[in-house]
Every structure is written in structure tokens, then in C-alpha cells.
Amino acid sequence: VVCRQQGQVLSEGSALHRCAVWGSPVVHSLSPVLHRAAYAALGLTDWEYARRDVDEAAFPDAFAGLDGSWRGLSLTMPLKEVGLRAARTVTQLAAATGAANTLVRDADDPSAWTAHNTDVHGIRTALELAGCPAPSSLLVLGSGATARSALAAITSPPARVVFMVRDRVRPETLAQARAAGTAVEVVPMGRWEAVRDVDAVVSTVPPSSVIGLERLDRLDHASARTPHGPAVLDVVYGTGRTPLQRAAAEHGWPVAEGTDMLLHQATEQVRLMTGLPAPLAAMSEALRDALAQHATGRRRPSQTPDPAR
């Protein structure tokens, strides 16, 4: 087997190449399902993908203990910021968002790792599949690491973001918006009538935090780029549609699925870690099978506001 990582020959022969998802908790992570399906479809018989429960306190020692067989890590909460600091090289998107959900080992220098943010790709693709390929304005519920990835998904000027939060917007999230020249508005959680003219709604908070959905139709969407209202993405997945998604569908608004974000951020991770094009069809089928097993009670995937899990 010969693999290429970021254009370079990584290895050949039968040496084992290890990747994993780290975070806390990760017991119900679907990342192993997706990555293992990719390895099988690509014929990478000497690659393995595991999960490991690692919190912020344990991360430095765990990371320092990785031997030369390790090629990549998928990072979920609470490691997206500490993982960024561990990397020697940080990509533009990871730097802009202050969050990394992917660490990839350099093929030429085993001591060097690069931090990536593939959540942005996942969000952009999920919105595109819902008919909103180039949003210039977003309503973002929450202001944490995944919210910063949503902010980076704005691709069309003039950029504007409305944050809907219970308390206040995190300073690092405000700093990212201002550094990008994005106009910022802040409204309290549930004040849908205070939101005007957004192309898409992205929720990065637990479903129980979203209130006032009986007033969702008061959101002013006269100028939305999608003809039937703003595209609505809830990054939570695993137990069917969330109350926000159901309310949006009742109003005829296009709904983006959290599983689409999960799938497409994972395809980008596979590409970065192996250097090979990700087998989208095989990964999509594996995800559908895992969710179907959950629906029949045989396993429980994670429903989480952090889609790297």
C-alpha cells in the first residue's frame, strides 16, 4: 500500500497507520464508522481508526505519548482550542476560528502537526445542499467554537451575522467577526422577531436551549437568498429532526441536516489524513446504516452540538 499525504508519499508496506477521535465524551462517536468505511473503500488495510476519551487536562500527556504510527486526530469538545495550540502549523481557517477539529502529522517531520478546521467545510456543504450555497448573512445560535466555524462559512459580501445567545457573545467570537469585517448584531435567545433578513440559520446549541419556536415565523426573511425562507441547519444529529428543524419545515423553509455537516467534515478529514480523495458514497452509506441501527435501538449515536463527534 502506498499512500500520499498532502502530495507526499507517506509510507508503504505493512506498517500500521493510526488515527482516532479524541474528546470527552466520545463513547457514542460516529467518526469511527465514517473513517473505517473510508479505509475499507480505499483499500487501506493497514490503517485503523479508534476513539479515546481525553479531556483538556489529559491532552498534553496523551498527545506527547503518540508514537510514529499516528497520522491524524479528529478533535471534538473540549479539545478544539487546546489542539490548536499543540500544532506547529495552523491553517488559515483554523487560525481565523481559533478552533481545530483536525490534527494531521507532517509526512516529512514526525514532530510537526498541522491544525485544520473542517467544520467550516461541513457547514458550507450542508447549507449548499439545502439550497443556500453562498450565504452573506447568518443567524447563529450560540457563540462557541462551532459558532465560529459557522461565522467562517459566510462567503458572500457584505457579510453580516446575528448572534442569538442567552447571555453574551464570547469575546473571541466577536473578535473573529470584527477581524473579518463582518457586521455584528446580538439578540436574546428566542427573540426571533428581532432578526431581519438572514440567508441561513445555524444552531450550535443543544435543542433544549432553543426557545420561543412558536414565534419562529416572526423572523423577517423577505430578503433571504433562498426563495422559501432561510436555510436552517441544526448541527445536532442522531435522534431525528430537532424542534428547530421541525418548526422550520412547518413554515416551508429549507432544512439542512446535521448529518450532512458530520459527513462532509469527515470526508475532508479523510482527505487530509490519507492524502486520498474521500469515498463519499461509501461513507454516506455507512452513516445511514449506523443511524438506521440507532433507530431500531441497536446502538446510540451521539446527538451533540459539536459535529466532529
What are the language-model segments listed below?
Residues 231, 235-309:
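Adenosine-phosphate binding glycine-rich loop
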Residues 158-180:
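NAD(P)-binding Rossmann-fold cofactor-contacting core
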Residues 180-256:
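Rossmann-like adenosine-cofactor binding region
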Residues 16, 134-137, 229:
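Phosphate-coordination loops involved in phosphoryl transfer and adenosine-cofactor binding
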Residues 12-130:
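Phosphate/diphosphate ligand-binding glycine-rich loop within oxidoreductases
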Residues 23, 117-120, 127, 131-155, ...:
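Glycine-rich adenosine-cofactor-binding loop
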Residues 156-160, 251-253:
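Conserved S-adenosyl-L-methionine
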